[in-house]
Each structure stands twice: as structure tokens, then as C-alpha cells.
Amino acid sequence: MQTSLTIHDRILRIQTLLEEKKGEDIEVFDLSGRDYIVEKVLIVSAMIGRHSHALLDHLKTELKPQGEIFYATEEESEDWLIADLGDIMIHIFTPNHRKKFNLEEFLNTLIASKA
């Protein structure tokens, strides 16, 4: 089963679920029409490493029964977790790792270069 919601509605649902579990500084990047592997990237900060796993577990628990497919997850480091939903990529960072890797700058540059 796969969800029949639009990508916009799926993003809103993901944001709501992350906010329910105290995910912070949620940003969404629209990469539609760009030379990138997904249409949307969502970045969220977790308070600490264990919180990262709690956020990802909450997403899986709530979204899988609704038809969302998690094609892959990267969970080796609690400082940076990744969930691949096919056309949406979710990055869950601890604040220090989010600042260190500054994925937002890369994504904004990618968006601006194709404007």
C-alpha cells in the first residue's frame, strides 16, 4: 500500500508528527525540477541523540500504517539520522551536527544555481 496524499500534504503530516515529539527548527527544501535525488528535503533538529531516534521511530510508527514507505534509513549515528521516502528525504540532526555539516547551505546553493 502506498499513500495517495500529495507530496505537499505528506510534508505537512511529517512536520506535524515531528512537532508533536518536539522536533525543532524544521526546514523544508523544494528541489522539484532540480538535478537532485528527491523532490523535497526536510531537516529537523533533535535535542540530543536519543531524541533523534525517538523522532524517527515516531515517524515510522505513524506513517507506515498510512501507506508511507521507508525505502531506507541510516541510523548508525544518533547525531544524524536519514530516512528515504522515495521523493522525500528526512535528515534528523543534533544541533552541533546540523551546524557542522550545514546541509541547508548546500541545498540553498543547489536551489539558487538552477533558478
Short names for language-model regions:
Residues 1-38, 47-81, 88, 95-97, ...:
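Polybasic/polar functional segments that serve as interface/processing modules
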Residues 99-102:
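Switch/connector loops and helix/strand junctions flanking conserved nucleotide-binding motifs
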